[in-house]
Every structure is written in C-alpha cells, then in structure tokens.
Regions:
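Metal-dependent nuclease catalytic cores in nucleic-acid-processing enzymes
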Residues: 147-171, 349-354
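Metal-dependent nuclease catalytic regions and adjoining charged, substrate-binding loops involved
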Residues: 14, 144-147, 162-243, 360
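Metal-dependent nuclease catalytic cores that hydrolyze phosphodiester bonds in DNA/RNA
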Residues: 2-133, 264-305
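Short secondary-structure boundary/capping segments
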Residues: 53, 185-190, 336-343
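Flexible loop/turn segments at secondary-structure boundaries
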Residues: 52, 144-145, 179-180, 250, ...
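A charged, amphipathic alpha-helical module
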Residues: 209-317, 327
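Conserved RNase H-like, two-metal-ion catalytic cores of nucleic-acid enzymes
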Residues: 114, 308-361
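Active-site ExK catalytic segment of metal-dependent nucleases
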Residues: 111-113, 122-128, 133-145, 152, ...
Length: 361
C-alpha cells in the first residue's frame, strides 16, 4: 500500500482552526456514495487522491457511453422536459436552474440538481405529477434490477426529502430484455420497463442511508487519514474498484486471493493470522482439496498435470476440429429481430489439428 503525507491531505481541506466541518470535506455524490458502500478506503481515495485511480478500461468507457445513450432515449418519453445542462462542478447554477424549472412547472426535469447534508445528487428524471409531488426515475442501461439500484435511488430520496421535495413514487427505468426490434423508430414504451421501488427505497433512505452517510462523513472528517481496509471481495463486488491496482500492487507473489473459491470466512482467518502469501499457509490449515492442490504447486514451483487429462487426450480421434467464432452485442438493438444485449455472431474460423501436429486453418 502506498503511503501519503498527512500534511498534504490536511492542508487541502482543513479550516483555519484545523478542525474539519462539513464545509471543509469533499461533497458526496451518487457515485461516491456507492463507492463508500463498497469500501471506505476507496471513498477516501476518490475524494482525496483521485489521481491514484486506475485508467478506465475499454469496457468501463463503453458502459458509460451506453448509459448516456440510454438516458437520452429515456428523455424522449417525457416531452417538454427541461435539461439541467450545467457542468457537475457548477452546482450553484445547476441548483438555481432546477428551481427555475420547478417554478415554471416543467413536466419533467432531467439531471435535476439538489444538495442536502453535504450530498449533491443529480436525478436522471424528476417527473412532475401536477399536485405538488414528483416521481423520481433512475435510468439504467441494464436489463434487471440490482441491489445497488435501490441504494442509488435511496440516497437521492434522502437528499430530495431533506431539500423539501415531496416524492410520491420512485422507479427504476431499465431496458426490457424481451423487447424485439422490428425496424424503424424504437417503441420506447416497449423498450423500457419501470420497476416500482418506492417502498423499499424510501425505507432504506430513512434508515440505512442516514447511518451510511454518517459513517462516510466520519471517514472524510478524520483529518484526511487513510482508513485501514483489508483486501477482499469488496475489491471486485459489486464493481471492480477504481483503485484496485493501488491496493494490490504490493501483494506478494501468489497471494491468497489466487486460491480457488476463497470464502469470506477463510479470507478473514488468513488475514487475522497475517498470512498474505499462499506459500505461508501451513499444512493442515483446513483448505479444500482444490485449494490444497494450489498450495502444493506453489510450494513445489512445479507444473502438475492431472493424469486423467492425459488419458482423455489420448482417447481423442484425429483430426481435431476447433471452432472459433466472434459475436457482437448492442445495448439498444440495431438489427431487426434482435433484443437488447443479444449476442450476434458475425465471424467464425475453423482450426484443424492433425495427428502429426500440423494445423490447418
């Protein structure tokens, strides 16, 4: 784990009395809240050392672009909606623009911006019900409802209610996995599905979110000190951490994370015993059969081949044919008869291995 100068961090965010207040610490957002739920150390890095983040992968970049595209399509379902188009960091003007749209009774507001309790949120869609209440609609490019969608909506509800906005219903708007594209303009009423998550999201917003925000604010108020968090499943679940490399670059050769089917219980036990390398796991530690095989291979530094594999290969009849094919998928279907995320083959190759070792393509 890298180390950082405490004075560097503190000087950026402390006030004249060297005491942290909500005015001194970084603002939380929807994404930072999700990060804080996953790992306190990741939240610390995101707020104080964002430069340490891994470079975004092609998949992450594509996912972001797909999300933006789906969000724009969702806007088309709310004619007359007003887009709050100020930059994320121009929050004062964004909030003023939001209030203006509300005062003008806009039927829907896209990227409506509110702040409460040092948390800044931008709502995907805030639909005006015409009776002084609003519906909160979170748009996702996924085809199913996930737990993190509930927490995402819940923190927004917490801020909206704290800001005095009356929310009647909360929805997740996602892609319909059964939608089949018939060509021409998309039927948006069929492309999208709305899940009513009002009850569970409001309950979470009024109980768990308050507790979670208090914990996260305490992490950020703690004089900029890096919290202690062991590596674990939170490094990749529910998302690959943006600071994965930072926490894993100094691990020993063949760390315990390479053990197959490593349970939380075993991980905790190993860390408690200060064992981070597979080679340091003592004999009789209670590993599974597969894990013990890995330990033995690491200790012997030799390749082990299961005899049954050789037997299986000897039973094969030549020539052997290997079929390789490539597929593509589009989030929003572009070809008639296809669905969101459907795998569409577009290329194949056949490799033929002869008994004398020659390969034919």
């Amino acid at each position: 784990m890298g180390t950082f100068s405490q004075s560097r961090t503190v000087s950026n965010f402390k006030n004249s009395n060297n005491i942290y207040t909500d005015a001194d610490i970084p603002k939380l957002s929807k994404s930072r809240f999700q990060t804080g739920l996953q790992c306190s150390k990741a939240l610390y890095y995101a707020c104080y050392h964002p430069d340490l983040a891994d470079a975004p992968s092609e998949l992450m970049t594509a996912t972001q672009k797909n999300g933006d595209m789906v969000g724009r399509l969702a806007h088309d379902m709310f004619p007359g909606g007003v887009l709050i188009d100020e930059d994320y960091y121009d929050r004062n003007n964004a909030m003023a623009h939001t209030q203006q749209a509300m005062s003008e009774n806009a039927p829907a507001i896209f990227e409506a911006t509110f702040m409460h309790n040092n948390v800044l949120v931008k709502n995907d869609i805030l639909q005006n019900n015409g009776d002084g209440t609003y519906d909160l609609i979170e748009v996702k490019s996924a085809t199913s409802l996930k737990n993190q969608n509930i927490t995402d909506v819940a923190v927004q509800l917490n801020v909206l209610e704290g800001a005095g906005i009356k929310v009647r219903n909360a929805y997740l708007m996602r892609l319909n996995p059964k939608y089949v594209y018939n060509g021409g303009e998309h039927d948006l009423d069929q492309l999208f599905v709305k899940d009513d998550i009002t009850d569970i999201a409001k309950k979470y917003a009024r109980v768990e979110v308050k507790h979670d925000l208090k914990r996260m604010h305490n992490v950020l108020r703690n004089h900029g000190r890096e919290p202690k968090c062991d590596i674990g499943k939170q490094c990749t679940t529910p998302f690959q951490c943006s600071f994965y490399r930072q926490c894993h670059e100094n691990l020993p050769e063949h760390p315990i994370t390479e053990l197959p089917r490593l349970s939380d219980k075993l991980m905790t036990r190993l860390q408690k015993d200060n064992i981070m390398a597979i080679k340091d796991i003592p004999e009789g530690y209670g590993l599974s059969e597969a894990q013990e095989k890995v330990r033995q291979v690491v200790l012997s530094n030799d390749v082990k081949v299961d005899p049954s594999v050789k037997k299986e290969f000897r039973s094969l009849n030549y020539p052997l044919h290997f079929l390789d094919f490539e597929t593509m998928q589009t989030v929003v279907p572009e070809y008639k008869g296809t669905r969101p995320y459907q795998q569409i083959p577009f290329q194949y190759s056949l490799h033929i291995l002869h008994e004398d070792g020659t390969i034919e393509h």
